[in-house]
Amino acid sequence: EAQFKVEFECEFLGSVDTLIAPSKLRTLVYENPVQRNAGLDVYEPPKDKHDYIMTVDVARGVGEDYSAFVVVDITEFPHKVVAKYRNNDIKPMLFPNIIYEVAKNYNSAYILCEVNDIGDQVASILQYDLEYQNLLMCSMRGRAGQIVGQGFSGKKTQLGVKMSKTVKKVGSLNLKTLIEENKLIFTDYEIISELTTFISKHNSFEAEEGCNDDLAMCLVIYAWLVQMDYFKELTDQD
C-alpha cells in the first residue's frame, strides 16, 4: 500500500522545480516493452551495426535503492533508450553478470559505471573476472576533473565515473538539453516517472523526498559521457 502510494504520488506531483521543463514532461508518452524479464525491459532488440552504451548505477542491494542501468542506441541522433534494468533485490555480486550478458548482447556496448561506493566492486568484476573489453575508465586530471577513456593506467584511474557535484551538474544540465531538444528519446514508464520528480535541490538535482532517481542518475551519467571529447571521437558526433 505504502509503496503504491509513493509510486502513485511520485507520478503525479509534477514537481515544481523539475530538471526537465514541465511542458516537455507533459508530452512524454510511455509504451509497453516488447520484452520483460526480472527487471529488464527491452524496447528494441539489438540491431546489426548499431552502437550502444550502457550506464550503470549500483545500489547496495538492500531494498531502498534500485540497481539500475540503461542501454542507449547512440548510432545517430536522436539517441534512443532501447532497454533498461531496475531491481532493488539484486545482490551487488550478481549484478555484473546481468550487465555483462545484456551489454554483450547489444553489440558489446560500451559500459560506464558509477563507482562511488559498491559500484567499484561491480566494475572490478566486469574488468578482471569477466574480462569485459568495453568498460570505460576515468582518469583524474587536476582542474579538468575526470576524463573518460579506455586503457588508462596509474594511480588516478578508476574503472568508471565518480559521481561528484561537477559530474552531476554537467550531466544533469546536458540531459535537460538532450531531452528538451529531442536528441534523446525514450518511452519507459519508470524513466518518465522519475524525471517527473527529479528536481532542483541544494544547488543540485535529486529525487523528490520518497521518490527514486536510479534511472534518472543512469541518464545523468549518460549525458555527462556524451559531452566528453572521448565520446565524440568514439562516434564522430557533435
What do these predicted regions represent?
Residues 1-56:
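ATPase catalytic-site recognition across NTP-hydrolyzing enzymes
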Residues 4, 14-18, 105-108, 181-188, ...:
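Intrinsically disordered or highly flexible coil/loop and linker segments, enriched in small
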Residues 47-74:
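Gly/Thr-rich phosphate-binding beta-strand-loop-beta motif of the actin/hexokinase/Hsp70
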Residues 75-202:
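Mg2+-dependent endonuclease catalytic cores in nucleic-acid-processing enzymes, primarily RNase H-like
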Residues 12, 26-29, 58-62, 73-76, ...:
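Short, flexible loop/turn elements at secondary-structure junctions
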Residues 165-166, 207-215:
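Structural motif
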Residues 84, 213, 220-238:
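Acidic two-metal-ion nuclease catalytic site recognized across multiple nuclease folds
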Residues 68, 94-98, 217:
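Well-ordered alpha-helical segments embedded in enzymatic catalytic cores
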